[in-house]
A protein has these predicted regions:
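Non-globular, low-confidence helical/coil segments that flank catalytic cores
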Residues: 2, 7, 22-348
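Bacterial N-terminal signal peptides
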Residues: 10-24
Length: 348
C-alpha cells in the first residue's frame, strides 16, 4: 500500500475510534431507570424498567372492564420496549390491585409473582380474587416468591428492599435511616385496620442516588409501626402516595419524615385524593411538586395540583399515564402523557 494511502487509512481508523469513544462513554452513563404510573382508574399498576432492561410490575389494576387495565399495562410495556414481565409484585389482594392478574397473564409472559403470603381477609370478593390469583400461580412455568420485611427482591440493575409485608415491618434501619422521628408526635394512633390494606407489601427501590418508595395501601397505624419512634428509611426522591391518597393513610409520621422531593398520586376521579391526605402531602417539608393521575372530583380546585401536573383532567378519561426517568446521580424527569409537559429535577 502506498505511503499516502497508508496515512489516509490510519487517519480514518483513528477517526472511527474517536467517534466510537465519544459515543461509548455517554451510552454507559445515559442508562436510566424508567417508571410508568399507569392509569387504572383508582387502582395501581406501576411498571418499573431498570437500566439493565429488567422489569417489575407492581399490581395489575382491576379485573373486568373488557381487559381495560391489562391492555393499558401491555401498552406501557410496548412503550418501554419489553416483551415480558420479569416480576409482578402484588401488594395485597384487593380487586383494584390483584384483580387484573388473570387478564394480564393471558396477554403477557410473567416470570415470577411476588406477594406477602396467603390472604387473611374474609370478604367474599377478596376471597374470589385471591382464588383466581392462586390459579394463575399454578401455571407452569410461573414462579412464586413470598416476600418478608428485610428481603431483597432480585431485580437486576437496582436494589429493591421489602419494608412491610403481611402486617409486619422492617426491624433494622436501612442505610440513611435510623434517626428519631419527631413527626410521630403529630400522628396520633387510629382504630386498627383488619383488612388486606394493612398487610400491604411495601418496597423501597434504590438506583444509586435515586430512591423511590411504594407502600401499596398501607394504612395509618401500620405506617406508625414502621416509622416510629425512629425513621428506618431516611429520605426519598419520589413517594407514591399510599392508598391512592385516601385519608386512611398518609400520616405525617411517614410523609413528613421521608421528605420526598416529588409525590405522585395514583388516584382516580372519584377514588383517592382525599382533601386532608392531599394537604398533608402538599405541605410536607421539602416537597417540590406533586403529580396526579386524575383530577380528584372531591378536592375541587383547592385540593388538586395545576392541570399541567395531572394526567387525566376529565372524569371520563383516556387512560393517560405519568412517566418518570431517573439517572444514577439522583436527577430525574417526570412526563405527563396527556399534554407532554415535562419537568426536570436536578441531583441533590
Amino acid at each position: 500500500m502506498p505511503t499516502v494511502l497508508r496515512s489516509i487509512f490510519a487517519l480514518s481508523l483513528l477517526a472511527v475510534f474517536a467517534i466510537a469513544a465519544a459515543f461509548a462513554l455517554p451510552f454507559v452513563s445515559a442508562k436510566t431507570l424508567e417508571i410508568y404510573f399507569i392509569d387504572v382508574e383508582g387502582g395501581q399498576a406501576t411498571l418499573i424498567v431498570t437500566p439493565t432492561g429488567h422489569s417489575l410490575l407492581i399490581d395489575t389494576g382491576w379485573r373486568g372492564f373488557e381487559g381495560r387495565d391489562a391492555e393499558r399495562i401491555v401498552q406501557a410495556a410496548k412503550a418501554a420496549k419489553i416483551k415480558q414481565l420479569d416480576y409482578v409484585l402484588i401488594t395485597h389482594y384487593h380487586r383494584d390491585h390483584v384483580g387484573g392478574v388473570p387478564q394480564l397473564a393471558d396477554r403477557m409472559k410473567v416470570g415470577t409473582f411476588i406477594d406477602h403470603g396467603p390472604n387473611m381477609e374474609d370478604a367474599r370478593v377478596v376471597k374470589e380474587d385471591y382464588t383466581d390469583y392462586v390459579k394463575i400461580l399454578q401455571r407452569v412455568p410461573i414462579l412464586h416468591m413470598v416476600a418478608k420485611p428485610g428481603d431483597t427482591i432480585p431485580l437486576k440493575g437496582v436494589t429493591v428492599q421489602v419494608l412491610t409485608a403481611a402486617g409486619e415491618h422492617l426491624q433494622s434501619p436501612l442505610a440513611g435511616g435510623g434517626q428519631p422521628n419527631t413527626f410521630c408526635a403529630t400522628s396520633p394512633k387510629r382504630e386498627d385496620d383488619p383488612s388486606e390494606n394493612a398487610r400491604s407489601l411495601g418496597i423501597l427501590l434504590t438506583y444509586e442516588h435515586f430512591r423511590f418508595l411504594d407502600l401499596g395501601d398501607l394504612t395509618w397505624n401500620k405506617e406508625l409501626e414502621l416509622m416510629c419512634p425512629a425513621n428506618p428509611i431516611g429520605t426519598v426522591s419520589v413517594y407514591l402516595t399510599s392508598h391512592h391518597g385516601l385519608d386512611q393513610s398518609g400520616s405525617p409520621a411517614l410523609v413528613d419524615a421521608i421528605h420526598p422531593r416529588v409525590a405522585i398520586m395514583n388516584n382516580g376521579a372519584r377514588k383517592g385524593g382525599s382533601p386532608s391526605a392531599w394537604q398533608i402531602v402538599k405541605e410536607s417539608p421539602g416537597l417540590e411538586d406533586m403529580w396526579q393521575l386524575h383530577y380528584a372530583m372531591e378536592g375541587g380546585k383547592e385540593h388538586n395540583v395545576p392541570d399541567s401536573f395531572i394526567a387525566n383532567v376529565d372524569e371520563h378519561c383516556e387512560g393517560k399515564y405519568i412517566q418518570l426517568t431517573a439517572k444514577s446521580d439522583g436527577s430525574f424527569t417526570v412526563y405527563n402523557a396527556r399534554n407532554k409537559f415535562t419537568k426536570a429535577y436536578k441531583p441533590q
